[in-house]
Structure formats: structure tokens, C-alpha cells
């Protein structure tokens, strides 16, 4: 009996090591080189410290709605512009969260949205400039379970709000004559990830999400998004851009079931 008692701590230690080694191996594995190959066809990556900024909380309060802000850091005198920004959440089931194409004349300098984060992970922002070069910045986020977290609304409520859009403009500190604008688009949509479970049937809810969004001022492109399952429920984009004097702001969204949602709004002049 004494021999068995003595062996128990040793067995516990060995079991602890057995379970710890796979966890440590997973932690040590860096998926980023493979993602560069798969998403960017192994194109060279330059340090984006002076080109593209990414801001996220180090420890997320809610892994299903983690705020992220992407910001241009190009100097005003730089003749180049950011053509697109790809957001990659390295350890998510579908790492490419979104790709944003920026209108050539819109001068979009900042984009904020909300994403799901499934594991402790690096998150990369890759900017492609008008000269064809890629620049990358990253942050580390502590969050888990965001892709499988239950929806915030029940299925009936989500269906009733499907495709409903809201547009907001925000006052800025620039002089009234400034053409810089700040706006927000919100779309009612469950954006199901395919990893969430129906609490009644205990079956997985099929993936169903906004995969395309186009924003224009009159007919001039401001911003478009190719989205995936990592974009949170009820997609929400807040962004800055330069007005071309358009009177109408338009949005068109498509989802993976083929629905098309459109809306447009009057553009308020600064100070009104």
C-alpha cells in the first residue's frame, strides 16, 4: 500500500507533463509563416511601424465582440496611399477576418470594427500600398471562445432585423471648411460563424454572414469589405474619409445566402 502511495505523486507528475507538452507545443507553433504563404502567396512583408497601426485590447472583455482599429500612419507628404488592409487573426478557425479595399479618392485613414477571437493570438494588419509593397504590424490579444460564443439575439429577433442598416455621421474638430468626415455603418445580421451551437437542438448553426460590403459617396467608392466568420454579430464599421461633396451616402451588403441589402442616406454638411 505504501508503494502505491509513493507512486501517486510520480504518476500525477507524469500526467501533468504529458498534458503540458502538447499545450506548450501548440503555444510555440507560429501559424504566421503559413498564413503569409496561403493568404499572400509568400510575398515579402515589410515592417509596417510607420505605415499601418493596429489597436486592440490586450485582454478582451468579451471574445465575441473585440474592438479593433486600423489606422494609416503614412506621413502627409508621402506620395503613396494605402490600397487595401487585410486583417488576420492568426489562431482563428478562418484566420482572414476581413480585407478592406480603400477608395482611391476617399483618403480613408481609420477603420474600426468588432471581431471574434477564438484563442490567445497574434493579430496582423497587412497594408498593400499603391506601389505594390506589403507592410505588416501586429498586436497580441488574450481572448478565447469568441467564434463559438452564443449569439446575443435569438433567431427570431435576428431574422426580424436582418439587413436593417443604420448610418451615422460624427462631428469632428477640424474647421467647418474641412472635407474630412467620420461615419459609421451598422447592419443587422447574425453573422453566424458555423461554430455556434443551437441551445435547443444542440446542433451547430450553419455559417451565415455578410461577405461583401460596399460604401460609396454618390457613385465614388469609399470603402469595401470582404468579410468572414470572424466579423462579429451585427457588423459595425466606423471610418474616416474625405468628402467629395456628394449629397448621398450609399451602402450595399451581400451575405452568404445570396441576400442583397441596400440603403442610402442624405449627407449632412458640417455644422448642420
Language model segments and positions:
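N-terminal edge beta-strand
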Residues: 36-63, 157-180
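Beta-strand signatures of extracellular beta-sandwich domains
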Residues: 84-88, 212-216, 252
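Aromatic sugar-binding surface patches on proteins
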Residues: 103-111, 229-238
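Bacterial N-terminal signal peptides
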Residues: 9-18
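Surface-exposed, short loops/turns at beta-strand junctions within beta-sandwich domains
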Residues: 114-120, 240-246
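Low-complexity, Pro/Ser/Thr- and charge-rich linker/hinge segments at domain boundaries
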Residues: 28, 144-167, 270-272
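Short acidic/polar inter-strand loop motif in beta-rich domains
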Residues: 129-136, 254-263
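Short edge beta-strand/loop segments characteristic of extracellular beta-sandwich folds
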Residues: 55, 67-76, 182-188, 198-203
